[in-house]
């Protein structure tokens, strides 16, 4: 489909359908309780079947038969026959297990990373996965942080080279071709530098250090063609990354001209309330989408609140349509 055809499709969608399209839930949340979630707590979300029929993407359904069953049921119910996207974490291999990224980084070998990512793409694509939340571009220099092993290490140049190698292998020359998947670089930005090495903690650094040391790996991944970006959990410069116009709009959109979709991490829109920057789910949703966050993962504040926000004028229809277009464009690109 052309961009004009995708825009025409968006014009036919109701507001509720658009809000469902920019929401990602795991299979349990909309009627597939036998598919065990692979990550995160059960948030207790159970949504109306009519809304479930328009959900845009699924988190961590990792086998072909379940994915096919979900897709078939979804396409029978979705009023516009818009397919689901299936997304999953691939940390160090899918079925074939490789050394952790930190160990792979010690090889100083982009070709090793390419081979591991190529095999993971092959195995995951035939298991029904369209997008992986990988590679992790977070540069790490504090061994106390509990996710050090998911990073390629402490050097900006090496991280940049290895992230780009991983993206190239996941996506191939044409991501639509068999045995390839789209790459989502994470966690934007500087998630690997929390104070005291404590997970989810505040990241406090100058913007100069951010740009010189911590951003190059993400940018390298995007220059290699990564289709998506995941926003991080933490606070940077006193604003949570999931609601940061500086990170998600000024850097990603304005400076780097990134045109793809940006997704939250697990329930990070809801966590804006715990951060103290939003009074409730409505304000959290407004701040996130206004900052440039297209997809809400594993919470439903967009679905529950943004219809009212549109009526009140605190967000615009264009913001919503832009987010939906980015998602539909990726689905179209993946075939």
Indicate where each model-derived feature is located.
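Glycoside hydrolase catalytic-domain context in secreted enzymes
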Residues: 1-335
């Amino acid at each position: 489909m052309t961009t004009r055809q995708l825009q025409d499709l968006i014009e036919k969608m109701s507001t509720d359908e658009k809000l469902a399209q920019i929401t990602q839930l795991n299979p349990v949340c909309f009627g597939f309780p036998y598919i065990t979630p692979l990550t995160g707590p059960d948030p207790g979300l159970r949504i109306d079947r009519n809304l479930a029929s328009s959900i845009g993407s699924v988190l961590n359904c990792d086998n072909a038969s379940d994915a096919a069953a979900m897709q078939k049921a979804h396409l029978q119910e979705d009023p516009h026959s818009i397919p689901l996207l299936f997304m999953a974490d691939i940390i160090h291999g899918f079925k074939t297990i490789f050394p952790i990224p930190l160990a792979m980084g010690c090889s100083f070998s982009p070709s090793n990373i390419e081979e591991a990512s190529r095999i993971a793409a092959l195995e995951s694509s035939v298991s029904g996965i369209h997008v992986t939340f990988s590679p992790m571009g977070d540069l790490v220099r504090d061994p106390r942080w509990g996710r050090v092993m998911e990073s390629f290490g402490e050097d900006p140049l090496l991280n940049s080279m290895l992230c780009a190698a991983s993206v190239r292998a996941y996506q191939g020359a044409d991501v639509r071709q068999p045995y390839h998947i789209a790459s989502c670089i994470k966690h934007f930005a500087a998630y690997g530098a929390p104070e005291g090495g404590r997970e989810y903690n505040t990241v406090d650094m100058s913007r100069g250090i951010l740009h010189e040391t911590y951003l190059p790996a993400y940018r390298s991944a995007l220059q290699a063609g990564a289709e998506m970006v995941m926003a991080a959990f933490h606070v940077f410069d006193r604003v949570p990354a999931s609601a940061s116009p500086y990170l998600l709009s000024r850097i990603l959109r304005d400076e780097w001209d990134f045109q793809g979709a940006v997704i939250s991490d697990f329930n990070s829109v809801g966590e804006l309330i715990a951060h103290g920057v939003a009074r409730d789910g409505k304000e959290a949703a407004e701040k996130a989408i206004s900052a440039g966050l297209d997809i809400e993962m594993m919470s439903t504040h967009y679905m529950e609140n943004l219809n009212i926000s549109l009526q009140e004028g605190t967000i615009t229809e264009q913001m919503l349509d832009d987010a939906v277009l980015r998602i539909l464009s990726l689905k179209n690109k993946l075939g």
